[in-house]
Swiss-Prot record:
Protein name: Type 1 phosphatases regulator YPI1
Basic and acidic residues bias (residue ranges): 30-43, 82-97, 105-114, 122-135
Polar residues compositional bias, start-end: 1-10
Main location: nucleus
Cellular component per GO, a single term: nucleus
Compartments where found: Nucleus
UniProt keyword terms in alphabetical order: Nucleus
Key word Nucleus present: yes
Region: Disordered, residue numbers: 1-160
Gene, per the UniProt record: YPI1
GO molecular function: protein phosphatase 1 binding; protein serine/threonine phosphatase inhibitor activity
Family, similarity comment: Belongs to the YPI1 family.
Amino acid sequence: MSNRTSNTTVEPRGSEVENRENVLLLRRQSVPEHESNPQERTKATQKKKKKKPKVRWTEDVVDNEDMNKKKTKICCIFHPQRNFDDGTDSDHSHSDSDSSSDSSGDERGGHEGSSRGPDGGNDSKKIVDGVKKEPIPNAYEYQPVYKNESKLPPGINDER
């Protein structure tokens, strides 16, 4: 540590500080001439800013949960809550004899397509009313259908 002590003095406005060596300037005293013209200043800042490419989204692009974050692929799956005030769903029976139910497996505590066979492995098909049904893929397994709107110039790939 040094044995130097510092003294802070407040000078009245307008008085000159004779010893400029220990003075910290917080504002510039004078503005350079090339920065004094506002038009030149805006041109200089415009040159510094790089032009970013603008992305144009088509109508079929996913708006990520109405947050105005456009994405070309699904990163989260949002399922809005259903109204349970409807009397149609509340009369639903969870018994095995109710075959007219089209409810998902997670309402019964299970999952679609996760039934286990006698050997303990996953069955590829689920038996309902004696008929084997294909399991419905969940939203992460389902591959959306994309429209290929790109067009090749005439003369390329005409063998089709």
